[in-house]
């Protein structure tokens, strides 16, 4: 019985959701569930210390644990290595901060009722996914009373951030880290099936030419190499917005390279 109990406790303590909660508590974040259509989205929110905050800073998670193998989708896309969560926790600013998970990440039971594997595979950037993220950001913005948002997305969350920036009128700054900003080129590069039910961020690049932005990639990233974001930066007319470093892999500690100060004056 003791062995069984110890195994149960060990399983609980390694739960990605409990790990996220514990990290959030250490940094003064609280859990929020956003009721949107069709998804319930998991978020972690910090109110910041500004008495009258103007800006909400949003960090959007990557695709998470989307695949068990190259041919078998995962049953739960909750990230094992939540890079965007680490980025949010490391934000040194005074503004409110929202960590926003992608659909079906971290949620359980009835909150997963609309979760099917297409939403973390072929439809990971589908219109209803973007609409759901958009609704959650609007709810969080109302909570803190912010006038504008800064969007920062990691990996596939970078693509989501781009599509949200095109959709919303209140985005002051767009940032991506190892962002999948040209999904057709990426699937061809990796030799995987096209994201047939998803929007391609590249298609909205020209509409974002006047938006301040920064797109960080790394030569050491073999999952989404710099050439993917370079195509996007050229299309926005802001080639200088692409910043390339040398020694961080796709799932590495990007917060050491991000340069949070690029957002502060926005």
Language model feature labels by segment:
Residues 18-48:
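N-terminal cap/lid segment of alpha/beta-hydrolase-fold proteins
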Residues 179-180, 184-252:
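The feature captures the conserved acid-bearing segment of alpha/beta-hydrolase catalytic domains
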Residues 37-40, 47-101, 105-108:
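Short, surface-exposed "cap/lid" segments of acyl-processing enzymes
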